[in-house]
Amino acid sequence: MIRKAFVMQVNPDAHEEYQRRHNPIWPELEAVLKSHGAHNYAIYLDKAHNLLFATVEIESEERWNAVASTDVCQRWWKYMTDVMPANADNSPVSSELQEVFYLP
């Protein structure tokens, strides 16, 4: 498995709405993530800084990257644009993090 971590932002007034939309996520989005090899996906909220820290284990970069081109992912991104900063393609503004320590 490949471990990934990334940081996103959430609008200051949208913490509760962001959480509501993820509890649960759409069943079809969950199915796409799983069918593309995503495991143990978690998102954490830092309310003080309006940051979201996400971790996910993936089977391959290729399969993970393919999620973005699915219809359900495109719809999800559009759905989330009012609660978080987004790029021109509606994907969330994010920064990938470099792993510096891991204790198996």
From Swiss-Prot:
It is an enzyme of class 5 (isomerase). It holds the Pfam family rhaM. The active site is at 22 (proton donor). It catalyses: alpha-L-rhamnose = beta-L-rhamnose. InterPro entries: Dimeric_a/b-barrel (IPR011008), L-rhamnose_mutarotase (IPR013448), Rham/fucose_mutarotase (IPR008000). GO terms for biological process: rhamnose catabolic process. Its EC number is 5.1.3.32. One of its GO terms (cellular component) is cytoplasm. Substrate binds at residues 18, 41, 76-77. It is found in: Cytoplasm. One of its GO terms (molecular function) is L-rhamnose mutarotase activity. Pathway: Carbohydrate metabolism; L-rhamnose metabolism. Its main location: cytoplasm. Keywords: Carbohydrate metabolism, Cytoplasm, Isomerase, Rhamnose metabolism. It comes from the Bacteria. HAMAP family: L_rham_rotase. Homodimer. Belongs to the rhamnose mutarotase family. This is L-rhamnose mutarotase. It comes from Escherichia coli O1:K1 / APEC.
